[in-house]
Swiss-Prot record:
Pathway entry: Amino-acid biosynthesis; L-isoleucine biosynthesis; L-isoleucine from 2-oxobutanoate: step 2/4; Amino-acid biosynthesis; L-valine biosynthesis; L-valine from pyruvate: step 2/4
Cellular component annotations (GO), alphabetically ordered: cytosol
Binding site for Mg(2+) 2: 190, 226, 230
Source organism superkingdom: Bacteria
Ligand binding (Mg(2+) 1): 190, 194
Cofactor note: Binds 2 magnesium ions per subunit.
UniProt binding sites for substrate: 251
KARI N-terminal Rossmann domain mapped to chain residues: 1-181
Protein name stated in the entry: Ketol-acid reductoisomerase (NADP(+))
Residues annotated as binding NADP(+): 24-27, 47, 50, 52, 82-85, 133
């Protein structure tokens, strides 16, 4: 797998172009501000009436309605929520994209699953930072960067890849390393990670542990500390030094319990069998079709689950305990503009 760094990228491929960033949420604000600070001619495209409009202007960015921003641009980076991209593309992006322009994404979902079918005259590429927007911005400001994936879906001009690499350099990603991949691999592995491990898997493991302790008569506060609060301590060790490094840092008692009892909590082969089914549903497009239909009918399953999970006792206990820890800073995610 090829990794590219700053010396591999020529900013000239992006400095000579007008870039429109659609959206000013977590990734949008970071991309737009980093591009601006790198000397790129950037404007932000937002819906009229968007709550993000004033924020973007206050940050010193030029803000336009989506269609107008697209008409001006040579490169259009789409940083809207997955479920909104296809409609915005059909109604406001495609009719205004100049011939021979470039269409860019930070996630391959809509292109890979055919929700967006770009014209043949366009370059289509992706730069996907492997970190949240606030980190993409803060690391750039420190003179560092967040690693990113880069991929080309369509190369009409013959220079799609160097342009994508230049874009990655302009947002700071090439300082840390840019890994070449494909839209297929980025999309399918990203969805799998979210569903099986990072979001779906981890939340079920946490909830099961919390409920087991509470149902056995332990105080909910103790259960929360042991099954929720301390997750960060272990994840940080894994993040910094891998599984081996984490095990080096914990007690021998904890390490022995890890090896001898972990399979009771998460049976490895059975878990892999279930994970293969999750992956099959992603690869076949079944999940994508389900998610698109869910949005077409008003997101009833999503909303019902939000309410159900928000009502779980773990939320009330956690809220009380976090209020006792002033060193914690709650981060409220803003709606993508």
């Amino acid at each position: 797998m090829k990794i590219y760094y700053e010396h591999d990228a020529d900013l000239g491929f992006i400095l000579g172009k007008k870039v429109a960033v659609l959206g000013f949420g977590s990734q949008g604000h970071a991309h737009a501000l980093n591009l601006k600070d790198s000397g790129v001619d950037v404007r932000v495209g937002l819906r009229k009436g968007s709550r993000s409009w004033e924020k973007a202007e206050a940050a010193g960015l030029r803000v336009l309605p989506v269609a107008e921003a697209v008409r001006e641009a040579d490169v259009v980076m789409v940083l809207l929520p997955d479920e909104k991209q296809a409609q915005v593309y059909r109604e406001e992006v495609e009719p205004n994209l100049k011939e021979g322009g470039a269409l860019a994404f930070a996630h391959g979902f809509n292109v890979h699953f055919g929700q967006i079918k770009p014209r043949k005259d366009l370059d289509v590429w992706m730069v996907a930072p492997k970190g949240p927007g606030h980190l993409v911005r803060s690391e750039y400001q420190k003179g560092s960067g967040v690693p990113a994936l880069v991929a080309v879906h369509q190369d009409a001009s013959g220079s799609a890849f160097p342009t994508a690499l230049a874009y990655a350099k302009a947002i700071g990603a090439a300082r840390a390393g840019v890994i070449a991949t494909t839209f297929k691999d980025e999309t399918e592995t990203d969805l799998f990670g979210e569903q099986a491990v990072l979001c779906g898997g981890l939340t079920r493991l946490i909830r099961a542990g919390f409920e087991t302790l509470v149902e056995a008569g332990y105080p909910p506060e103790m259960a929360y500390f042991e099954t929720v609060h301390e997750v960060k301590l272990i994840v940080d060790l894994i993040y910094e030094a891998g599984l081996k490094g984490m095990r080096y840092s914990i007690s021998n008692t904890a390490e022995y319990g890890d090896y001898t009892r972990g399979d009771l909590a998460v049976p490895l082969e059975e878990t892999k069998r279930r994970m293969r089914e999750i992956l099959r549903q992603i690869q076949s497009g079944e999940f994508a079709r389900e998610w698109m239909l869910e949005n077409q009918v008003g997101s009833p399953v999503l909303e019902a689950n939000r309410k159900r999970w928000a009502a779980h006792p773990i939320e009330e206990v956690g809220s009380r305990l976090r209020a006792m820890m002033p060193f914690l800073k709650a981060r409220v995610m803003e709606e993508v503009g």
